């Protein structure tokens, strides 16, 4: 029997791992990449390309290397825990080379349309029209994996800012920003306090005369560096922490988180405290913002009510004159124009079962990969989604009925609406551990902690209290990797390695990652006791 041919659209993080997932399942991938290289979002270019994600030169990833790597290919131990975008791209190049992925990619090829074949209800096949160097080609595929991301179309709500058309200074979306040199000596307003808004305000404040950071709601600011210097996602992303947070309930979780965040700096005093709870919005990750605020180089302001030719008037009645530049860090919209009616997106809302499969198709041969915004890394989620999708394409896994899928989609949407503030930013939100565990169950690779407690208690303990790293989903089941156990048990060694650039005698009483976790759990238990008794 001939191999099923699968179209993979995009060769960023999701696209690369999906090519590999196809190969693991004996499928034949053909990847279409509109640019001339891999990397997607993480390939920096001085001039942004239309239809392609764009980053600024200084971008550091917000998730640590142990949490963001692909499950069977750890990031080299000497790489920093939080990598510069150039190092992320280099990791992707190593991954592509290691698994021989490049030969399956057709560069400078744009996907024009993806349509059902006339016999789709029985064949599940798709007609894919592509264009390369001005010439169109039509191919038929047995499945399609859409890996185009959700950071390509800038959301620029100019209608919400009266007077912007009269403003004589420069204004643009944060997607166009590259470096702070051109803002030297200028007065700059950054609108939006997501990760990009915070980063830009901090970086520009090193050259600008004054930076104003405008926010509608405020934000809770999370540091990359946690207790004892461990990466914050390493400390927060464990199964035991996840179990306890469910037991404690949302009110106690939020109270505890807000107390921890305010110990670093008082969000109310700094003008950042929002009305929503700490977990009611995706937190902003920024290590330097409080330092720039307390130095007066960044001033936090409310929402802009209107612009004049040279000034901004805020909703509290205050005014800032002689504004030179306005940067809209207002996020992104996403769409799939080449899919026509197969996947409908309305105000950044889309109906996908488990955030992957459109529920209305007669055959489950189309999957959207990486369309999720977790408090954690997207790459390993994309990988698990790809592993699941290729199993479904191959017929190894089945999906529920359309009505069952829609019921779950609506239930998830209602839960997200209750938890998060109404925002374009929260339409594809998902919890990192819950999402990973859920899909791992579907793939058949979720570790059995109870069984391991008897056969390998050391490993079971690490899986329970240690960080929920991607490599844990290579311990058993399809795609099992022989190096998984050792990689899990040496996680702390790789965290420490890039920091040991000066030889220091290690204190035998020093605090290990496990000790830090036990202390955190003890504090959490105490918080529960105090809250309820």
Swiss-Prot record:
Species of origin: Rattus norvegicus (Rat)
Full protein name: Flavin-containing monooxygenase 5
PTM annotation (Phosphoserine): residues: 54, 58, 401
Sequence positions bearing Phosphothreonine: 284
Swiss-Prot/TrEMBL GO biological process terms: lipid metabolic process; regulation of cholesterol metabolic process; xenobiotic metabolic process
Keywords for the protein's UniProt record, in alphabetical order: Endoplasmic reticulum, FAD, Flavoprotein, Lipid metabolism, Membrane, Methylation, Microsome, Monooxygenase, NADP, Oxidoreductase, Phosphoprotein, Transmembrane, Transmembrane helix
Reaction equation(s) it catalyzes: N,N-dimethylaniline + NADPH + O2 + H(+) = N,N-dimethylaniline N-oxide + NADP(+) + H2O; NADPH + O2 + H(+) = H2O2 + NADP(+); heptan-2-one + NADPH + O2 + H(+) = pentyl acetate + NADP(+) + H2O; octan-3-one + NADPH + O2 + H(+) = pentyl propanoate + NADP(+) + H2O
Record family assignment: Belongs to the FMO family.
